[in-house]
């Protein structure tokens, strides 16, 4: 029988062992990123999801949940100092609300955590007119966008109604799927970021991309933008190229019903200046590129002179992307690629379209009214300028999108 002192030693040993395990688990997640702010985002999301996993899920959200936040300040002198800043702050806005939204959008918190923390987010060369920067999670399922403090305030203004709308439509919407909003502070640099589901696919590459507002004034991509590998083209580019979206009557009806409902909701909130983001996947082009890629890999393996074969390490993030059963070219999982629509059988090319509403946080306030007056003077009252009131904006937007679907 163990003596009291032996029992105490045993308990102490057990506690020590537990602490050691906890320390090792922390070291596995190094949150390596070239930008310290990204390292802090990875750390913060990991910390937040771990904390939320211990909180009981409430039956319903309370008004205070829409004002709540959690924040933590870290003075990090010893642990993982090669990868993490010495001092940083992380703040999460409305954690219970965003957890509920993730659930309603069919996103598991563990999967969300893995996507944002297992490997560093990847920079995206898209840049909004506001100067916002974008990253995608390493598995391309989520988009991380820098936003302004005004955007954070507007998000708080609409969050309760947005959440209610998502509840009523059962998460079936073309609106951005807001999944988390954070403030990061490193060495005196403070940024705000919002995480949304990626409109585009994690596996079907997009070769053409458009940002459409239904306006024709100053709605053409710049020469600098067009020089990019995947430029963001605009309304006049779409019209001048004779581009069309070829979807069948059934998909068209479903899409336009969702779009109309979403846009009416935005008009009620006095929101405007949003866009329809359109991405086009060319099935035959993707197949051809895959064949060429495989041929090149075969040549490289043949020239490697018995060196280690080229491949993905067993524990690398790359292996998580294709854990689901393989899909045929142009096929997709509608639970993951929620914005994807196939072209109809008579389309000139076999394509898959990804379409969703983006950038919904612009409120029609005094500034927008002034901009509208100035542009009306410059371009004339009949010009299709983008700064019109929310009702006009929504009507013109719906008319334009209705005409490009065929």
Swiss-Prot record:
Ranges of residues in domain PIPK: 33-405
Top-tier EC class: transferase
A molecular function (GO) term: ATP binding
Residue numbers bearing the N-acetylalanine modification: 2
Post-translational modification: Phosphorylated in tyrosines. Phosphorylation is induced by light and increases kinase activity.
Residue ranges, annotated region (Required for interaction with PIP5K1A): 59-65
Stated role: Catalyzes the phosphorylation of phosphatidylinositol 5-phosphate (PtdIns5P) on the fourth hydroxyl of the myo-inositol ring, to form phosphatidylinositol 4,5-bisphosphate (PtdIns(4,5)P2). Has both ATP- and GTP-dependent kinase activities. May exert its function by regulating the levels of PtdIns5P, which functions in the cytosol by increasing AKT activity and in the nucleus signals through ING2. May regulate the pool of cytosolic PtdIns5P in response to the activation of tyrosine phosphorylation.
Protein name per UniProt: Phosphatidylinositol 5-phosphate 4-kinase type-2 alpha
